[in-house]
Regions:
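Iron-sulfur-cluster electron-transfer modules
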Residues: 2-132, 139, 270-279, 301-307, ...
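Juxtamembrane/interface segments at transmembrane-helix termini
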Residues: 29-47, 99-102, 132-150, 169-180, ...
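Juxtamembrane inter-helical linkers in multi-pass membrane proteins
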Residues: 40-63, 144-154, 181-187, 224-255, ...
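Membrane-interface segments at loop-to-transmembrane junctions
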Residues: 48-49, 71-76, 108-118, 142-162, ...
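Hydrophobic alpha-helical membrane-insertion segments
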Residues: 80-90, 155-175
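Iron-sulfur cluster-binding electron-transfer modules in prokaryotic oxidoreductases
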Residues: 187-197, 240-248, 254-255, 260-263, ...
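Ferredoxin-type iron-sulfur electron-transfer modules and their immediate structural context
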Residues: 212-342, 391
């Protein structure tokens, strides 16, 4: 057979036709990619050129290994088949375009068989993946795809189907090996005519050309942008927020030395270049919207739409942006205030995204600008922010009342100790959560730990202020707490609030707290049980489930320890562990009014009540409040107790039992 490139089609030779197709398609593709690249590079600087070893390892696992893609078993498997298939067959594109045109062979003879076998395997995997995906879309449409246009996705699948099937037809005329290329060999047995194969060849090349046209105009731009997006994703502590400014020593610039023209993000170019790559990396898979508590409760936030908004803004204002001008439309106007202030910062969207898109920082950066520059933030936050500034707690109680809950406990207050129990605002002032603080300190003393509390010297960790966007107030609180830690020589901290645990343990490192060892109380309690210094929980017929707080499980990575403390759970909630559903209090939502027909905590409470357990164990003061309110709202009589309460109640009950027995003997 004369290769299609060497044939003449009217006035043009085959190679001339291919040259025209390649020039047009590759030229258009290249233009669109460089335009998107320019729109990315006008972003602000970002220090993502560190830790090359970890980045390379993460890239291999995350991009090549498709680690996060496979968390959705069905859709993930289909995607992996197409992804790995295309990786193996990409090299064949050049071969098909040049075979029999160049006189020299590119591969040694002994490699040809295995190479062709690998290429055929790649086409086969891609074919299976695309057919499976098409059937799923048509016959078993996922809920998130219902009611949405699937034209773009279906066209891409048809193109992949065309590319793969025509490759087998072309292969059939190249004397395929029955061992290395069984499918091509089978097509060879069909006896396809020369004209059929020639048509297949040009359909193959046409499909590739159309594919190149569509990639930069669709969500499939992720085929290009995913590579830098995954490689340069944040490999630091999960959900750690950046300081306003970082000095040469890598630490946050002190408040008195700050010299900043603008706070947070108002315009497109104030986002960093890494944040902007996200905009062209989104595949519109919908995983982020599926796990978003704000979206689930009917609020105006869809994390996927936030990413689309950034990309659409860039494309619509490209001439102005690329000429160095700033469009009148702000990013807050495009993304909307409702979306920005609905976020609970639970990080579920970031955690589940297969391409490591960072949704939450885009919203918190907008909050920073609204809170510290334009002053256009929800009025309801004024009370909490004012209280934090004047009394170092969002409730507005006096500092002298912080340790009232411990008045009858023999505990060090404001004195050096091996461990400092950082009580947190909720456990200091909320009557319900004061029981948690009493249980925790009693357990630690029971185990013989040298532990103390800061009392009136303790201030809020600053989490509510920082997540609300008031970075200035957060830094004031952080610097004040760090001064206290340094004065008392604090090295080890125990926190029962996951928000304090995260902020003190991960974010205070930028303010001189890099040597602090911060533990969640469930970690310490589990360790003390393992050492035999505290007893194991005996449930005595009581059934327990556990609600994983976002900042403890998904963000903090502490999943097993709370369960160990309570002797395991009897029934897991529908969403648990790393995939737990938010209670609705994070991201400063605790201090805002939830305005929607469905409430986040009620959605979660319903899931927990469906376990049929007697008790919901928690490990967060905010979760304790929100879950209890949610259970009351859905008519459930389940108890809500912190793991420390469950363990301490058992110890007290046993002591009472012993005392009763002694009394009877006497």
């Amino acid at each position: 057979m004369i290769h299609p490139l060497l044939q003449t089609y009217g006035p043009l030779d085959g190679w001339m036709i291919l040259l025209i197709m390649a020039t047009v398609s590759i030229g258009f593709f290249s233009y669109q990619v460089q335009k998107a690249t320019r729109l990315v590079l006008i972003g602000s600087p970002d220090s993502r050129f560190d830790s090359w070893g970890p980045r390379i390892r993460e890239f291999i696992v995350g991009w090549l290994g498709q680690k996060k893609v496979l968390r959705d078993r069905i859709a993930g498997t289909m995607h992996v088949l197409m992804f790995w298939g295309f990786l193996m067959l990409a090299s064949d594109m050049f071969d098909l375009a040049t075979a029999n045109y160049f006189s020299s062979e590119l591969l040694p003879g002994f490699i040809v068989g295995p190479w062709n076998g690998m290429v055929e395997l790649g086409y086969t995997m891609a074919l299976i993946g695309c057919v499976s995906a098409f059937v799923r879309r048509v016959a078993f449409t996922p809920e998130k795809l219902k009611g949405k246009s699937q034209l773009e996705g279906n066209v891409i699948l048809i193109l992949i189907f065309t590319i793969t099937t025509t490759s087998f037809m072309i292969e059939s005329k190249e004397d395929p090996s029955p061992f290395w290329e069984p499918i091509g060999h089978q097509f060879n047995q069909f006896g396809l005519s020369v004209n059929t194969v020639v048509v297949a060849y040009w359909l193959h090349m046409l499909a590739i050309s159309v594919f190149l046209f569509l990639i930069p105009l669709s969500k499939h731009m992720h085929l290009v942008m995913a590579v830098p997006n995954v490689f340069f994703h944040d490999i630091g502590p999960v959900a750690k927020m950046r300081p306003l400014a970082v000095g040469d020593d890598g630490k946050a610039v002190p408040l008195e030395d700050l010299d900043i023209d603008s706070f947070g993000v108002s315009s497109y170019t104030q986002y960093t270049w890494r944040q902007l790559i996200d905009a062209w990396s989104c595949t519109s898979c919908g995983r982020c919207q599926d796990v978003c508590p704000a979206y689930a409760s009917g609020k105006g936030l869809n994390p996927m739409q936030v990413i689309h908004d950034v990309r659409d803004y860039a494309n619509e204002h490209a001439p102005l942006l690329l000429s160095g001008e700033t469009p009148k439309e702000t990013m807050m106007q495009r993304i909307t205030e409702e979306a920005v202030w609905a976020c609970t910062t639970c990080n579920a969207c970031v955690d589940v995204c297969p391409l490591y898109i960072e949704h939450v920082p885009k919203l918190t950066d907008l909050r920073r600008n609204a809170m510290m520059e334009t002053m256009e933030y929800p009025d309801v936050l004024n009370t909490a922010m004012g209280n934090l500034e004047s009394t170092s707690n969002p409730y507005g109680y006096g500092e002298h009342e912080r340790a009232d809950w411990a008045a009858d406990l023999d505990v060090k207050i404001g004195e050096p100790a091996e461990y400092i129990y950082f009580v947190g605002c909720a456990a200091s002032f909320d009557e319900r959560n004061q029981k948690v603080a009493r249980s925790t300190i009693s357990l630690l003393k029971e185990a013989g730990l040298d532990v103390g509390i800061l009392g009136m010297q303790e201030g809020c960790s600053g989490d509510p202020a920082r997540r609300a966007g008031n970075e200035y107030l957060f830094q004031m609180l952080a610097e004040t707490n760090m001064m206290t830690f340094q004065e008392l020589g604090v090295k080890r901290i125990i926190a029962s609030c996951p928000h304090c645990f995260h902020t003190l343990g991960k974010e205070y490192a930028d303010y001189g707290g890099e040597e602090l060892e911060v533990f969640h109380h469930t970690e310490i309690l589990a360790k003390l049980q393992e050492e035999g210094r505290l007893p194991r929980v005996e449930k005595n017929g009581q059934s327990i489930t556990f609600h994983d707080p976002c900042y403890l499980g998904r963000i903090g990575g502490i999943i097993d320890e709370p369960r160990d403390v309570i002797g395991g759970v009897d029934v897991e909630a529908e969403r648990s562990g790393r995939d737990s559903f938010c209670c609705g209090a994070g991201g400063a939502q605790m201090w805002m009014e939830e305005e929607s027909d469905k409430r986040v905590n009620e959605i979660r409470a319903k899931e927990l009540s469906e376990t049929g357990c007697d008790t919901v164990a928690v490990g967060c003061p905010f979760c304790s409040i929100m879950v209890k309110d949610g259970l009351d709202a859905v008519g459930s009589e389940m108890d809500v107790k912190d793991v420390a309460e469950i363990l301490w109640e058992q110890i007290v009950a046993k002591d009472n039992e012993i005392q009763e027995k002694v009394a009877k003997v006497n």
